[in-house]
Amino acid sequence: METKVNKNQIKIGNIIINSRVSLAPLAGITDFVLRKLIREYSPTCLLTTEMISSEALVQKPDANISYTDEKESPAAFQIEGHKPELMAKSAKILADKADIIDIKIPV
């Protein structure tokens, strides 16, 4: 049975976001501190981490580039890369903490 959403919600997969506001994934900008500040002013918006290079994440999976806390739910991550095997490994690294994984393939 399909879950209905109202005009003030967005549905991505099985995740319902109770806001039509989303923070864009900007490398060097949307770090944990900014996301925490945005959450105080917009408690229901979708927060997205900085864009994360799949190569960097696979090389250093414990680096703080993917740091989030429970208040960021739903948590969205954008991974960038052009090598399918690295993109898959990156998605697996983030699977436990990500509600949404956005894939950016450079052209």
Q: Where do the language-model regions lie?
A:
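Glycine-rich, positively charged N-terminal anion/phosphate-binding segment
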Residues: E2-K11, L26-I93
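A structural motif
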Residues: P43-T44, A98-I100
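Non-cysteine beta-strand/loop elements that form the S-adenosyl-L-methionine
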Residues: T49, I100-V107
